[in-house]
């Protein structure tokens, strides 16, 4: 699910601490290091997600595409999130900050008086990461992000296997369709406009 939206929607449910054995091949609680944060500092593409809760499913289905930029602050343990999401054939921009809980291996976001957590699962070899939600609860969920919008058969298989490992079915996965992206061209035009504006400003005496 989209990074910003999933953390907002999850304010409806508390994150349950892992009291049961973790699902096979999914390791939670790996500490987040400076190296991890530097690796996360990049442009990311939301590829898809699987959620059991009906509210989450509905939210996932509204997202046509999404990409975002993560800019970590190693001193304050926060991450700046700039998100470009295509919904209803319209580009929507979101900006927020995420908290980093290094020892627990989680990211968090404040939604009012509630702090929502998600376990970070990094797959550096494949240039991807996942966010795990409520894996010990019936309303569990898993979302998938990559550095490129092209979902190769290998990456698709990796996420499908991860979904099965957490006790869900492949049929519950909703992948995005990047042919419906409305933000990339809009952002490109905006950047070109900003460059032209800067040039004109420099010309002025």
Swiss-Prot record:
Belongs to the calycin superfamily. Lipocalin family. Functions as a transport protein in the blood stream. Binds various ligands in the interior of its beta-barrel domain. Appears to function in modulating the activity of the immune system during the acute-phase reaction. Its main location: secreted. It is found in: Secreted. GO terms for molecular function: small molecule binding. One of its GO terms (biological process) is cellular response to growth hormone stimulus. The gene is Orm1. This is Alpha-1-acid glycoprotein. Keywords: Acute phase, Disulfide bond, Glycoprotein, Secreted, Signal, Transport. The keyword Disulfide bond applies. Residues 1-18 form the signal peptide. The keyword Glycoprotein applies. CDD domains: lipocalin_AGP-like (cd19451). GO terms for cellular component: extracellular space. Contains a beta-barrel that binds various ligands in its interior. Disulfide bonds join 91-183. Induction: Alpha-1-AGP is synthesized in the liver, the synthesis being controlled by glucocorticoids, interleukin-1 and interleukin-6, it increases 5- to 50-fold upon inflammation.
